[in-house]
Amino acid sequence: MSSMERKKFHLSNRHMSEHIDYENIFTPQGMLGHVSKHPNLDFLMNIFNIPRVYSVSGFGTWNVGQHTVAVAFLALYWSAFNAYPQEKRDRLVTLALVHDVHEAVIGDILPFFKTTAVREAIEAIQRDILSAFAIEEDQTLHDELKLLDMMGFLYEISQSSPKGIDPSKRKLIKQMYARQKEQILGYAEEAEIDEEKVNEFLKSMKL
């Protein structure tokens, strides 16, 4: 085996052996392995103490809890806009309320920093919490939930202000807003969600 092959073999083995023992992580509510399976209200409410990455970057003061509630309200508006039956509306709102609940313990992490091991741990924690409430992921609503999540960020950008930094950064906020709106419409097309309807909904929400 050449030195290059040995290096590749070593990296492959290291990648396969990567694992985050999240169950033994201590939290103020107890060991995460227990808390994620039996989440108490203190644990869940911690999302209001977790700053959004966008806020950490210097724009606004939003936390994960505010984002979560915004997405849940958007799910209500979206359901009314589409005249969804009560069962579908309630399902979508429930999923919106818990879509980022794992961030109560891991925080808001940029996708770039989510390694395979980190993603696996996040998914396991999320599954634990959903199972505690007998909530199952609904693939039929996955695309709409993702769309609403993106709209929630668009609303967050619209509410932000460059406090403590050069006012010229307002131009940057406008650019970020325009880019996020483009991404929403692009995702709608990709997910085969009526783009015209999405545009109409955004206008109705003044976004």
State what each model feature region is.
Residues 34-56:
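Short alpha-helical hairpin
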Residues 38, 85-101, 140-151:
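Alpha-helical scaffolds flanking conserved acidic
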Residues 57-91:
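Alpha-helical phosphate/pyrophosphate-handling elements in metalloenzyme active cores
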Residues 102, 106-107, 156:
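Active-site-flanking alpha-helical
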Residues 109-123:
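Post-HEXXH active-site segment of zinc metalloproteases
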Residues 121-137:
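Post-HExxH zinc-binding segment in Zn-dependent metallohydrolases
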Residues 139-207:
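Divalent metal-dependent phosphate-bond-processing catalytic cores, especially two-metal-ion Mg2+/Mn2+ enzymes
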